[in-house]
Amino acid sequence: MDAKDVVNADQARQLVIERELSHVKVGVFDVDGVLRGKYISREKFFSALDNGFGFCDVVLGWDVKDQLYDNVAYTGWHTGYPDANVRIVPDTCRNLPLEGNALLFLGEFSDQAEQVCPRKLLQRVLTKASDMGVELFSAFEYEFFVFNETPHSVRDKNYRNMEPMAPAEFGYSMIRNSAESDTYQMLLDLAEKMDFDLEGLHEETGPGVLEAAITYKDALRSADDAALFKTFTKVALQKQNKMATFMARWSPDYPGQSGHIHLSMRDRSGKALFHDASEPHNMSQTMRQFVGGLQILMPEFLAMIAPTINSYRRLVPGYWAPTEASVGIDNRTCAIRIIPGSEKAQRLEYRIAAADANPYVILSAVIACGLWGIENDADIEVMVKGNAYDQKLPEHLHLPTNLMEAAQRFKASNIARDMLGNEFVDHFAASREWEVREFRKHISHWELERYFEII
């Protein structure tokens, strides 16, 4: 039996026994999309398959630097950071080829904690979709820069003068991917063995930047694949004394790093709901409603889509990232690109997304907004032709320009609360407000250079 064949607890036990494993890795993804976990003994794992296991809920109450939130209701010093129950999900079993024959299982928080658990959030949104008689399918595309650096060397260099894997721009280069074929093959092999297969992997425009397209799957599995791809791409490269960054934009000299999402919808019989050959661009009424919801609600939900301070460094004109809630037909300057095609190929591309977003959180936002559009008979308000950067949309389609503004819009959104729940909205908005507060404590190198001597 292989990891991808596991669908229930009995098969999970059988595979662990077959591989004679003394310990198993289990992990949960936190609010920022960081995988937190540990090795547990075989005996504890077998018990946890039936009863779950306790995991300190601090992982839902701190930031990416393990700094404790002081502004959230769910957990904190006021609760004593108790254990929260985690349910192991057998069908998330993955091989860990970088650790011999080891296995990884994902978990998800249950009971009260599930209200702020990103994976459970996506499941709730998908349950709503199922109640409406529809199923969502998606695929993530990631751009990421690779450096000839280690976690130690980048700190020694204070994140300056870092050496990229390749020296300059050379998009789609066959020279580069041949010269670096060991790295490319390592990533392709990893993806195959961990069952997040890549449809494509190529050199992008920028020094050492790659783009990976993950295979299309049902929405929950797609988010699992995306989150694991980001995590274990970093692991694999660090084992080669290299580093990958999925920051939205790491340098002012280059465009940002996208995390585009391709999305389609079917009914329970498998019929493609975005396709209607009798309509312009094969775009069905359902697709218009779905995209209308995305366009109308993008400003309110942007905190889930652009969740870091750095996210907003990417959203500037002329750098392959949208700046308004724009929609266009096969138009890569727009936030939402409608891709006409056959019944199988008709889809949308959500291009506002950056590589730094939590896959579960952003996919929850996209699907929730689209479902709202269907329920409320929304329509595309403005369709852009030509360069979206040269056109000005109505003010209500302008996007927040910083994380604090986005967090305030999200917190005040009644639609977000109806679609996602008060507990999640309050917790996530507070976590973004915390991120802004941490940033404001910081004195940048730009400020020192500008003011230290002269002012």
List where the protein language model places each region.
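Glycine-rich, acidic/polar active-site loops that bind/position phosphate-bearing ligands
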Residues: 1-455
